[in-house]
């Protein structure tokens, strides 16, 4: 997994080396090809408080007061970008967990953090540890919609398996679909930013405190039969082609998922080759449809075990494919994984009818990000 130094401006990513020619792998892969198709915004902005409509004409005294409030790590946040369309925010990312901060009773403070993928919506609220339940969460979600004038979301993504019962129950009572997923990238980045600029400055901060609810990394299971392809290959695309592929993603693909590269601050040369995995099958459309419901997170080449690991949801890992370990195949797997790390974790999964085709039935742009420090 790549280690990224994130800031609110950009993540710097070095150039990606060329990947050696891929080899064939098994179950039920029989052949291999290099996928060579050439056809295959917002910058991160975190705010510390909501701005009143009269902010354009505030006095110097008010400016000083606002700066003090913005600098206060104990303050809460309720923000909606005034230029955004509130009705268009249909999916939220949510974390409800303890923080490395003690209250006056010496107990860990809990915090609700909510945003959307574009960070147009940003909300934080602290809670004592004796009110943590689905009712508290449900009421907090409703309060967000009332305070900011946004509708209830259709989906809420969350990444902590330990909170699944509470979050799912709260969402069910509000007719919201709870989606367990590590594709909460905006939330991941925001939590990292809050740790660096808010939590560590809080008067109750406990240095060295470990997360109460850590992320799961379970042993990989066998892949369900309906997710098998017939062939696969390590592949690579120029960064320019990746950007083109996701430029009008919703129009091109029924199946798949994109990333906001501007939000992530990815900076690489347009000719840099981004590693990926191409899977071909005569059942491309059904396979892509099945994959579409899995919240695909990442793919890992495990050269020590001679297999590829597919991570989906929040705590599910599959042995996606296996291969015969030889010096050549080991070098190829290690080169692919190294290239992925060098690109800041950026990689992709393409599902096709044929490995020689220039078209994809499904396309998932993926990235490895370290888990948040809280």
From Swiss-Prot:
Free-text disruption phenotype from the record: Albino phenotype and seedling growth arrest at 2 to 4 leaves.
Record localization: Plastid, Chloroplast
Claim: Transit peptide is one of the keywords in the record: yes
Induction: Induced by salt stress.
Superkingdom as given in the UniProt entry: Eukaryota
Function: Nuclear genome-encoded A/U-rich RNA-binding protein involved in the biogenesis of photosystem I (PSI) and II (PSII). Required for the light-controlled accumulation of PSI and PSII during early plant development. Does not seem to be required for the translation of mRNAs of the PSI subunits.
GO biological process, one term: photosystem I assembly
GO molecular function terms attached to this record: RNA binding
Transit sequence range: 1-64
Taxonomic source organism: Arabidopsis thaliana (Mouse-ear cress)
One Gene Ontology CC term in the entry: chloroplast
Region (Disordered): 58-84
InterPro entries according to UniProt: Tab2-like, Tab2-like_C, Tab2-like_N
Alphabetized PANTHER family for the sequence: PROTEIN TAB2 HOMOLOG, CHLOROPLASTIC (PTHR34556:SF2), PTHR34556
Name of protein: Protein TAB2 homolog, chloroplastic
Compositionally biased intervals (Acidic residues): 64-74
UniProt keyword annotations, A-Z: Chloroplast, Plastid, RNA-binding, Transit peptide
């Amino acid at each position: 997994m790549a280690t990224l130094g994130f800031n609110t401006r950009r993540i710097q990513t070095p150039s990606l080396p060329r990947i050696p020619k891929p080899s064939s792998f098994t179950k039920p892969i029989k052949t291999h090809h290099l996928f060579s198709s050439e056809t295959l915004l917002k910058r991160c902005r975190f705010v510390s408080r909501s701005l009143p409509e009269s902010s354009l004409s505030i006095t110097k005294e008010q400016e000083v007061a606002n700066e003090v409030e913005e600098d206060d790590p104990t303050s809460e946040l309720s923000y909606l970008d005034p230029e955004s369309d509130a009705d268009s925010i249909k999916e939220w990312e949510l974390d409800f967990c303890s923080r490395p901060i003690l209250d006056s009773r010496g107990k860990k403070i809990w915090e609700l953090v909510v945003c959307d993928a574009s960070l147009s919506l940003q909300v934080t609220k602290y809670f004592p540890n004796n009110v943590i339940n689905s009712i508290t969460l449900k009421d907090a979600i409703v309060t967000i919609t009332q305070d900011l004038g946004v509708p209830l979301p259709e989906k809420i993504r969350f990444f902590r398996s330990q909170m699944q019962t509470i979050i799912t129950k709260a969402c069910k009572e509000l007719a919201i679909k709870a989606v367990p997923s590590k594709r909460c990238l905006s939330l991941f980045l925001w939590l990292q930013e809050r740790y660096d600029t808010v939590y560590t400055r809080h008067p109750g901060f406990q240095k060295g405190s470990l997360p109460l609810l850590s992320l799961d990394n379970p042993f990989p299971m066998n892949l369900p039969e309906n997710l098998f392809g017939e062939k696969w290959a390590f592949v690579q695309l120029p960064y320019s082609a990746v950007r083109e592929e996701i430029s009008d993603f919703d129009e091109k693909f029924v199946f798949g998922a994109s990333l906001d590269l501007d939000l992530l601050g990815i900076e690489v040369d347009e000719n840099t080759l981004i590693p990926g995995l191409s899977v071909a099958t005569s059942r491309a459309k059904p396979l892509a449809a099945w994959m579409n419901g899995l919240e695909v997170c990442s793919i890992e080449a495990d050269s020590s075990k001679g297999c590829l690991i597919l991570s989906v949801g929040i705590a599910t890992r599959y042995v996606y494919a296996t291969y015969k370990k030889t010096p050549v195949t080991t070098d190829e797997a290690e080169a692919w994984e190294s290239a992925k790390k060098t690109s800041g974790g950026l990689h992709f999964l393409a599902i096709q009818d044929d490995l020689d085709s220039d078209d994809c039935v499904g396309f998932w742009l993926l990235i490895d990000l370290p888990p948040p420090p809280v």
